[in-house]
């Protein structure tokens, strides 16, 4: 009887909290008037609630359910403009090549044509070739360098194989290892050259399948371990230990450990940008919902959800109280429509669960913003789960992972009608 009573109490508590969040969503989802970022004069009045929620945060993470969500790209572009023009953010960090996009950007002559050329080759084409991002890459960012308030670019992804890394990473790494006295710690000059060849093979594999041969695996693994140990012994605080860890993470063969290592590396790369490269700047993070999620270490474990929920960049990053206080994580949600990445087929997004958050948003809202931080303060950060299509375009059943999404994201940007992005002409 006692067990039944306890279970009943827990159920009642969860139900009450669920009713609280439903009422909160219905009453506090703020309409957003437009996704159009191209207006010459924009007073951003409809984004005032976003600005108020963000407050003095130094990091704002902008998610997306899939890398083929056209309206989400448009919304993020307008949010980038708003954060840059009204909230003092001066760096846009993409889920793209940490070494190539960051180092290459430093070397770049900041002229409109050269900026466009560089971005097309050092940010994933999922975005740079999208018609929904065209204004951002071809106009807004390049033109910002004709003003007194330029928007700088950086990357934080540990996948180092885009244009600049493909052309320069091996040579730059060789120069670094020689100058740091690490090259001569290899067993022989031949072993060192085998390591460099394996690094280049791994970088080239994505564009030239077969470039990373099976016989390169051991030289790469052994070399990365040697370099990492030497860096640790030397207390190296440069970006190179992060690059080495990124290559290691990218070289792991099993998908789940590789993705976990990737997210950990992305969090470390972002911290480096904030503490070293752009130590006085506010940074906008452009990534997938799946990477920016917080508190995923507190969610249930299980083989069915480990890849999509466990050990995420946002979780690693906000474990540090310093960054937890200075970060606002904005997830994206949608009701219906299609999605589809460039180069792939479009697909219909899953309908929301009848009891899901999407059905609590007032039906007349095409776009809306919902701030969870006010709800969490009002109800002492309730951890009762509720349903939401997230981090992707489907609802994770509660039997697999009951999730309090109000603790995973600080807020949500809602789009009623999603559309698959199209290639820029």
What spans do the regions from the language model cover?
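Bacterial Sec-dependent N-terminal signal peptides
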Residues: 1-23
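Structured catalytic-domain cores with a bias toward divalent-metal coordination
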Residues: 17-425
